[in-house]
Swiss-Prot record:
Assigned keywords, A-Z: Cytoplasm, Exonuclease, Hydrolase, Nuclease
Family to which the UniProt record says this protein belongs: Belongs to the XseB family.
Protein function: Bidirectionally degrades single-stranded DNA into large acid-insoluble oligonucleotides, which are then degraded further into small acid-soluble oligonucleotides.
Keyword Amino-acid biosynthesis: no
BP GO terms, sorted: DNA catabolic process
GO cellular component: cytosol; exodeoxyribonuclease VII complex
Protein name: Exodeoxyribonuclease 7 small subunit
Quaternary structure note: Heterooligomer composed of large and small subunits.
Catalytic activity as recorded in UniProt: Exonucleolytic cleavage in either 5'- to 3'- or 3'- to 5'-direction to yield nucleoside 5'-phosphates
The keyword Hydrolase is annotated on this UniProt entry: yes
Alphabetical list of InterPro entries matching this protein: Exonuc_VII_S, Exonuc_VII_ssu_sf
Single GO term (MF): exodeoxyribonuclease VII activity
Length: 83
């Protein structure tokens, strides 16, 4: 599979693209069993990474548009350390 980038260093878009490639490779049926198992594990980790990035983005958006009562409060700076 070549060099495998660390998940933490991948943007959502990079992780999604890699996940699509993993799925394509698995669906082709051409990978040997051991490689298929490695691909599946990598794909599962990529899926979890993408979900975490989406969850973090959703939390930031909700913090921006709602106050503690759930009413629109305008824009507030979001925490740059999230995600």
């Amino acid at each position: 599979m070549g060099t495998v980038p660390e998940l933490a260093s991948l943007s959502f878009e990079e992780a999604l693209k890699e996940l699509e490639n993993v799925v394509r490779r698995l669906e082709s049926g051409e990978a040997p069993l051991d490689e298929s198992i490695e691909l599946y594990a990598r794909g599962d980790a990529l899926r979890a990474h993408c979900q975490a990035r989406l969850d973090a983005a959703q939390a930031r958006i909700e913090a921006i548009v709602a106050d503690r009562d759930g009413k629109a409060q305008g824009l507030r700076p979001f925490d740059e350390t999230v995600g």
